[in-house]
């Protein structure tokens, strides 16, 4: 592990000439304001070492990466019963596709596309007012990262609320098929706030370390999920974590991961480390263009791909 900082530094040097590539998510007004010429990366190893480079301490909107934490909460509440509400298969469609949801009777393909994440949020809301569910998620993420400074960006949440028409349509479809138990506006209120979680690369890598360490956080001693559940969440991230770019990410990077349209990607090298990278410019399927390039470089230079070096 001693040369990990040198590896990160070399990746940063190779990425620097390309910083600014990709297009920021302009359909969310607050994200459209983000300067694309930023790049950060952090690695937290299972033995507690932290390596960082670039803008790794700048908080950004984690967006769909939050779905990993919400899924963990939902599985903790209802266990395998969750899979009656949402599938475990790659979608092959855009993350906000309506056609597939209608064709499959209101059961989303997986928990990482928007419809699936909205159904997962509905599960977490059981017994909670919307504000309480938002608070539960924020407390959980702070607990995972051991960092009380993590917040939700209310401006981003409001921005999404004002423009999230497709998500409103998805939620109404599921409500019509009786796959949402709570009022649509309540569920979406929580969903938009969870997507507005603001975290730095280092905070994100710390929060997700339990998935690299068989369900426990070795830095805090907290047991989060069973080894079996950690393995299964990682499997879902590998197959479904990058929308209709999931196969391409597995091919080039070979690590379980989850992307967000804020430009972040969270990835796991099981038994070794958790990784977070951020570069706001997105590729055509909504994943960080340079984030994916940096992770491909990391996997190639470390041999961390789950498929071998």
UniProtKB/Swiss-Prot annotation:
HAMAP family reported for this sequence: Glutaminase
Stored Pfam families: Glutaminase (PF04960)
Residues bound to substrate: 64, 114, 160, 167, 191, 243, 261
Subunit structure: Homotetramer.
Listed GO biological process terms: glutamate biosynthetic process; glutamine catabolic process
Name of this chain's protein: Thermolabile glutaminase
Species name: Rhizobium etli (strain ATCC 51251 / DSM 11541 / JCM 21823 / NBRC 15573 / CFN 42)
Family: Belongs to the glutaminase family.
GO MF term set: glutaminase activity
Catalytic function, reaction form: L-glutamine + H2O = L-glutamate + NH4(+)
Domain of life according to the entry: Bacteria
Keywords: Hydrolase
Enzyme Commission number(s): 3.5.1.2
